[in-house]
Protein backbone atom coordinates (compact mmCIF):
# COMPACT_ATOMS: atom_id res chain seq x y z
CA UNK A 1 0.00 0.00 0.00
CA UNK A 2 2.69 2.48 1.02
CA UNK A 3 4.92 1.58 -1.91
CA UNK A 4 1.99 2.06 -4.30
CA UNK A 5 1.27 5.48 -2.84
CA UNK A 6 4.93 6.47 -3.14
CA UNK A 7 5.00 5.36 -6.79
CA UNK A 8 1.87 7.35 -7.58
CA UNK A 9 3.17 10.44 -5.84
CA UNK A 10 6.50 10.11 -7.63
CA UNK A 11 4.72 9.75 -10.96
CA UNK A 12 2.56 12.80 -10.23
CA UNK A 13 5.62 14.82 -9.26
CA UNK A 14 7.41 13.75 -12.44
CA UNK A 15 4.43 14.79 -14.57
CA UNK A 16 4.26 18.15 -12.78
CA UNK A 17 7.97 18.83 -13.29
CA UNK A 18 7.86 17.83 -16.95
CA UNK A 19 4.63 19.73 -17.60
CA UNK A 20 5.83 22.92 -15.97
CA UNK A 21 9.09 22.84 -17.93
CA UNK A 22 7.18 22.35 -21.19
CA UNK A 23 4.83 25.24 -20.38
CA UNK A 24 7.67 27.61 -19.57
CA UNK A 25 9.52 26.59 -22.74
CA UNK A 26 6.41 27.12 -24.89
CA UNK A 27 5.76 30.56 -23.42
CA UNK A 28 9.34 31.52 -24.16
CA UNK A 29 8.14 32.05 -27.74
CA UNK A 30 4.33 31.86 -27.73
CA UNK A 31 2.22 34.62 -26.12
CA UNK A 32 0.31 33.13 -23.17
CA UNK A 33 -3.41 32.99 -24.06
CA UNK A 34 -4.27 34.12 -20.54
CA UNK A 35 -3.08 33.98 -16.96
CA UNK A 36 -4.19 32.43 -13.69
CA UNK A 37 -4.86 35.94 -12.37
CA UNK A 38 -7.23 36.67 -15.26
CA UNK A 39 -9.14 33.47 -14.54
CA UNK A 40 -9.26 34.38 -10.86
CA UNK A 41 -10.65 37.84 -11.61
CA UNK A 42 -13.28 36.34 -13.94
CA UNK A 43 -14.42 33.86 -11.30
CA UNK A 44 -14.52 36.56 -8.63
CA UNK A 45 -16.69 38.76 -10.83
CA UNK A 46 -19.14 35.91 -11.46
CA UNK A 47 -19.31 35.05 -7.76
CA UNK A 48 -19.97 38.70 -6.93
CA UNK A 49 -22.69 38.89 -9.56
CA UNK A 50 -20.77 41.53 -11.52
CA UNK A 51 -19.31 39.71 -14.56
CA UNK A 52 -16.62 41.65 -16.40
CA UNK A 53 -15.15 41.52 -19.88
CA UNK A 54 -11.38 41.39 -19.79
CA UNK A 55 -9.55 44.03 -21.81
CA UNK A 56 -6.28 42.67 -23.11
CA UNK A 57 -4.27 42.98 -26.33
CA UNK A 58 -0.86 41.38 -26.63
CA UNK A 59 1.84 43.71 -27.94
CA UNK A 60 5.38 42.59 -28.80
CA UNK A 61 8.41 44.11 -27.11
CA UNK A 62 9.06 46.69 -29.82
CA UNK A 63 5.48 48.03 -29.65
CA UNK A 64 5.67 48.98 -25.97
CA UNK A 65 7.05 52.34 -24.89
CA UNK A 66 10.58 52.17 -23.51
CA UNK A 67 9.44 54.70 -20.93
CA UNK A 68 6.97 52.18 -19.53
CA UNK A 69 9.58 49.43 -19.46
CA UNK A 70 11.95 51.58 -17.43
CA UNK A 71 9.15 52.95 -15.22
CA UNK A 72 8.08 49.44 -14.21
CA UNK A 73 11.66 48.45 -13.43
CA UNK A 74 12.17 51.67 -11.46
CA UNK A 75 9.02 51.15 -9.43
CA UNK A 76 9.01 47.39 -8.96
CA UNK A 77 12.47 45.85 -9.31
CA UNK A 78 15.54 48.04 -9.78
CA UNK A 79 17.89 45.04 -9.62
CA UNK A 80 16.01 43.28 -12.42
CA UNK A 81 18.91 43.26 -14.88
CA UNK A 82 21.31 41.68 -12.40
CA UNK A 83 19.48 39.10 -10.29
CA UNK A 84 18.41 35.57 -11.16
CA UNK A 85 14.82 35.88 -10.03
CA UNK A 86 15.25 36.59 -6.32
CA UNK A 87 16.37 39.73 -4.50
CA UNK A 88 17.67 38.15 -1.30
CA UNK A 89 18.49 41.40 0.58
CA UNK A 90 14.98 42.69 -0.16
CA UNK A 91 13.46 39.40 1.02
CA UNK A 92 15.43 39.56 4.27
CA UNK A 93 14.39 43.18 4.83
CA UNK A 94 10.74 42.32 4.16
CA UNK A 95 10.82 39.38 6.58
CA UNK A 96 12.36 41.55 9.29
CA UNK A 97 9.75 44.27 8.69
CA UNK A 98 6.86 41.79 8.76
CA UNK A 99 8.10 40.23 12.01
CA UNK A 100 7.83 43.65 13.64
CA UNK A 101 4.16 43.82 12.67
CA UNK A 102 2.22 46.49 10.80
CA UNK A 103 1.56 46.46 7.09
CA UNK A 104 2.91 43.38 5.32
CA UNK A 105 5.72 44.25 2.93
CA UNK A 106 6.43 42.20 -0.16
CA UNK A 107 9.76 41.71 -1.92
CA UNK A 108 8.74 40.01 -5.16
CA UNK A 109 10.89 40.59 -8.23
CA UNK A 110 9.33 41.07 -11.65
CA UNK A 111 10.16 37.43 -12.42
CA UNK A 112 8.35 36.25 -9.29
CA UNK A 113 5.34 38.37 -10.22
CA UNK A 114 5.28 36.83 -13.70
CA UNK A 115 5.44 33.33 -12.19
CA UNK A 116 2.62 34.11 -9.75
CA UNK A 117 0.32 35.90 -12.20
CA UNK A 118 0.86 33.44 -15.03
CA UNK A 119 0.66 30.10 -13.25
CA UNK A 120 -0.60 30.44 -9.66
CA UNK A 121 -3.43 31.57 -7.44
CA UNK A 122 -3.37 34.44 -4.96
CA UNK A 123 -2.37 33.64 -1.40
CA UNK A 124 0.49 33.64 1.08
CA UNK A 125 0.90 29.95 1.94
CA UNK A 126 4.35 28.40 1.99
CA UNK A 127 3.17 25.80 -0.54
CA UNK A 128 2.24 28.49 -3.05
CA UNK A 129 5.49 30.31 -2.34
CA UNK A 130 7.36 27.10 -3.07
CA UNK A 131 5.62 26.74 -6.42
CA UNK A 132 6.34 30.39 -7.16
CA UNK A 133 10.04 29.81 -6.47
CA UNK A 134 10.03 26.79 -8.80
CA UNK A 135 8.42 28.65 -11.70
CA UNK A 136 10.62 31.70 -11.05
CA UNK A 137 13.74 29.55 -11.37
CA UNK A 138 12.46 27.99 -14.60
CA UNK A 139 11.58 31.35 -16.12
CA UNK A 140 14.98 32.81 -15.28
CA UNK A 141 16.67 29.72 -16.70
CA UNK A 142 14.86 29.61 -20.04
CA UNK A 143 13.74 33.18 -20.80
CA UNK A 144 15.70 36.32 -21.59
CA UNK A 145 15.23 39.37 -19.39
CA UNK A 146 13.49 41.07 -22.31
CA UNK A 147 11.03 38.19 -22.56
CA UNK A 148 10.31 38.28 -18.83
CA UNK A 149 9.56 42.00 -18.97
CA UNK A 150 7.55 41.60 -22.18
CA UNK A 151 5.30 38.97 -20.59
CA UNK A 152 5.01 41.04 -17.42
CA UNK A 153 3.92 44.14 -19.35
CA UNK A 154 1.34 42.13 -21.29
CA UNK A 155 -0.15 40.43 -18.23
CA UNK A 156 0.03 43.03 -15.44
CA UNK A 157 -3.27 44.24 -14.04
CA UNK A 158 -3.97 47.96 -14.46
CA UNK A 159 -7.60 48.29 -13.45
CA UNK A 160 -10.77 46.26 -13.14
CA UNK A 161 -10.57 43.81 -16.03
CA UNK A 162 -7.69 45.75 -17.63
CA UNK A 163 -4.62 43.64 -18.35
CA UNK A 164 -1.47 44.48 -20.24
CA UNK A 165 0.21 47.66 -21.41
CA UNK A 166 -1.89 48.17 -24.54
CA UNK A 167 -5.24 47.86 -22.77
CA UNK A 168 -3.95 50.04 -19.93
CA UNK A 169 -2.68 52.76 -22.25
CA UNK A 170 -5.98 52.90 -24.11
CA UNK A 171 -8.14 52.67 -20.99
CA UNK A 172 -6.32 55.30 -18.96
CA UNK A 173 -4.91 57.67 -21.59
CA UNK A 174 -6.51 56.86 -24.95
CA UNK A 175 -3.19 56.11 -26.66
CA UNK A 176 -1.33 53.02 -27.82
CA UNK A 177 1.28 51.48 -25.54
CA UNK A 178 3.99 52.62 -27.94
CA UNK A 179 2.95 56.28 -27.48
CA UNK A 180 3.04 56.53 -23.69
CA UNK A 181 4.92 59.53 -22.33
CA UNK A 182 7.31 59.36 -19.39
CA UNK A 183 4.71 60.89 -17.07
CA UNK A 184 1.98 58.49 -18.21
CA UNK A 185 4.37 55.55 -17.83
CA UNK A 186 5.29 56.66 -14.33
CA UNK A 187 1.63 56.93 -13.34
CA UNK A 188 0.93 53.43 -14.67
CA UNK A 189 3.90 52.04 -12.76
CA UNK A 190 2.83 53.90 -9.63
CA UNK A 191 -0.47 52.00 -9.33
CA UNK A 192 0.95 48.50 -9.83
CA UNK A 193 0.99 47.61 -6.12
CA UNK A 194 -2.80 48.11 -6.01
CA UNK A 195 -4.25 48.63 -9.52
CA UNK A 196 -7.88 48.13 -8.48
CA UNK A 197 -7.70 50.62 -5.62
CA UNK A 198 -5.67 53.30 -7.44
CA UNK A 199 -6.14 54.94 -10.84
CA UNK A 200 -3.35 55.94 -13.20
CA UNK A 201 -5.51 58.43 -15.07
CA UNK A 202 -7.06 59.98 -11.95
CA UNK A 203 -4.13 59.81 -9.54
CA UNK A 204 -4.59 60.42 -5.85
CA UNK A 205 -2.06 62.56 -4.02
CA UNK A 206 -0.20 59.40 -3.05
CA UNK A 207 -0.11 58.05 -6.62
CA UNK A 208 1.04 61.43 -7.95
CA UNK A 209 3.81 61.51 -5.35
CA UNK A 210 4.86 57.95 -6.12
CA UNK A 211 4.85 58.71 -9.88
CA UNK A 212 7.20 61.63 -9.22
CA UNK A 213 9.50 59.36 -7.24
CA UNK A 214 9.45 56.80 -10.07
CA UNK A 215 10.38 59.48 -12.61
CA UNK A 216 13.38 60.44 -10.51
CA UNK A 217 14.40 56.80 -10.22
CA UNK A 218 14.07 56.40 -13.99
CA UNK A 219 16.52 59.26 -14.48
CA UNK A 220 18.95 57.75 -11.98
CA UNK A 221 18.80 54.42 -13.81
CA UNK A 222 19.70 56.21 -17.05
CA UNK A 223 16.30 56.27 -18.75
CA UNK A 224 15.66 54.02 -21.77
CA UNK A 225 19.40 53.37 -22.15
CA UNK A 226 19.08 51.18 -19.04
CA UNK A 227 17.34 48.59 -21.20
CA UNK A 228 20.66 47.81 -22.87
CA UNK A 229 21.58 45.99 -19.66
CA UNK A 230 18.92 43.36 -20.26
CA UNK A 231 21.30 40.77 -21.60
CA UNK A 232 19.44 38.08 -23.51
CA UNK A 233 22.68 36.26 -24.39
CA UNK A 234 22.95 34.62 -20.95
CA UNK A 235 19.89 32.46 -21.63
CA UNK A 236 19.94 28.93 -22.97
Swiss-Prot record:
Domain of life of the organism encoding this protein: Bacteria
Enzyme Commission number(s) of this protein: 2.4.99.28
Main location: membrane
GO molecular function: pentosyltransferase activity; peptidoglycan glycosyltransferase activity
Family statement drawn from the similarity comment of this UniProt entry: Belongs to the glycosyltransferase 51 family.
Role according to the record: Peptidoglycan polymerase that catalyzes glycan chain elongation from lipid-linked precursors.
Protein name: Biosynthetic peptidoglycan transglycosylase
Amino acid sequence: MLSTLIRRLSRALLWFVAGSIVLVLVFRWVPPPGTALMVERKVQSWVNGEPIDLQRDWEPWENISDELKVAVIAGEDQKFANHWGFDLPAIQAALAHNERGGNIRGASTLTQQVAKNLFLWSGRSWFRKGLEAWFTALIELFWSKERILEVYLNSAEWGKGVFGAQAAARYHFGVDASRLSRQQAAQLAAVLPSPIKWSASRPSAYVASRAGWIRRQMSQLGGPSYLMQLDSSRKL
